[in-house]
Design a protein with these regions (language model features):
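Non-catalytic beta/alpha edge segments that cap or flank active sites
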Residues: 1-193
Length: 193
């Protein structure tokens, strides 16, 4: 038995070509692998592979939040191309916008490629769920979540557990070797035996 709170996590890959079978999706496996290595909590994943259609993306996000996902991560559809509408779909279902997540993702990605400035990742809260738009490439997903520890650049996931605490979700515990979560001392729980 796991002493940590169980958590439902929605993982959504947004891609016209992958959702129509033109090529294999790499986003969902990358997200599931990273989260499984990072979180000590028992996780129920709710994966979705969908096209770049704003109404479909918004409906999928609402469905996952309504199903009890405390965290929903999307990958893909955040660039400037005409079909890239993930941020618009996400903002359309938001109760609160959390712009710091997108700002930090761009800062991390700019360490590697100057075109990261074209990225439009965002984050929002809907009910008691945090929704994060991540980059489309598996390498960039890991970099933005973990940060660049050797350069002293924190990843966005360090703030995710405390954000979820603040909106009434489960207490997420991370493996510090992958990503050390930050919480104020007043928000820390004793470690389960």
């Amino acid at each position: 038995m796991n002493a940590f709170d169980p958590v439902k996590i929605g993982i959504v890959s947004v891609s016209d070509r992958a959702s129509s079978g033109v090529y294999a999706d790499k986003g969902l496996p990358a997200l599931q692998d990273w989260l499984s290595r990072t979180l000590k909590n028992p996780i129920e994943f709710m994966p979705r592979l969908i096209p770049d259609e704003q109404a479909v993306i918004s409906a999928t996000l609402v469905e996952l939040v309504d199903a009890g996902c405390s965290l929903v991560l999307t990958t893909g559809g955040t660039g400037p191309a005409l079909r890239d509408v993930t941020p618009e779909a996400t903002l359309a279902v938001a109760h609160k916008e959390m712009p710091g997540f997108g700002e930090q993702m761009r800062q991390i990605s700019l360490q590697f490629v100057p075109t990261a400035i074209l990225s439009r990742q965002t984050a929002v809260i809907r009910d008691q769920s945090l929704i994060l738009n991540l980059p489309g490439q598996p390498k960039a997903i890991a970099e933005t979540l973990e940060g660049l520890p050797a350069r002293g650049v924190p990843g966005i996931f360090a703030a995710v557990p405390y954000c979820i605490d603040l909106i009434g979700g489960p207490y997420l515990e991370t493996d510090d070797a992958v990503c050390k979560a930050f919480r104020p001392k007043s928000a820390l729980r004793a470690m389960p035996e």
